[in-house]
Amino acid sequence: VRKICEDYGGRIKSFCTFDSSLSSIVDRAVGSKRFRVKVRTRGGHSYNDFGNDNAIAGLASLVGKLYKIQVPEGGKTTYNVGMISGGTSVNTIAQEAGMLYEFRSDKRENLEYMERQFMEVLDRAKAEGMDVSFQVIGVRPCEGQVDPAQKQALTDWAHRVVEEMTGQPPKHHAGSTDCNIPLSLGIPSVCVGSFRGAGAHT
């Protein structure tokens, strides 16, 4: 989708894609930003070098601080540490530990707020002597300036089609789909469900 929008964005009048359950329509974009964070220390032997900084302990303190961030009001904003790793053995003071962290929101200004909070946590840790680095591993934009009338017309059309196919009026909600990029470029877009079932990401 990113490549399609790069090559043909100026010629696309509207965009429709398929994801999630058949009873749903995603008509608002949830943007996100994802990071790989690493903490490094000298490490050492758990007995002989006791007292040396432990990368896992340092990472744990970062996770605790990130989870104290108060999400902004307006829209829905979330964050998550989805994976952690580190250390080499039970009797080794960990020299390196890492995590995957993301935040999401259906408001662009809230994404910007969460990024500022994330950077403040890392900057404070660095100022206190922690060797911490990060890498951006994923960016999905929020909605841009989309013509409200054109977007509503597309959403209404999708609603009618789904209701005719299923006999049930679909539920509308925000989500992170292939519509994010065209919506960020101002292209009216909608994501229609395509399956019956449950348990996504389990």
Task: Label every model-predicted segment.
Residues 1-32, 102:
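Acidic/histidine-rich catalytic neighborhood of metal-dependent amide-processing enzymes
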Residues 20-27, 36-51, 55-202:
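Metal-dependent amide/peptide-bond hydrolase catalytic core
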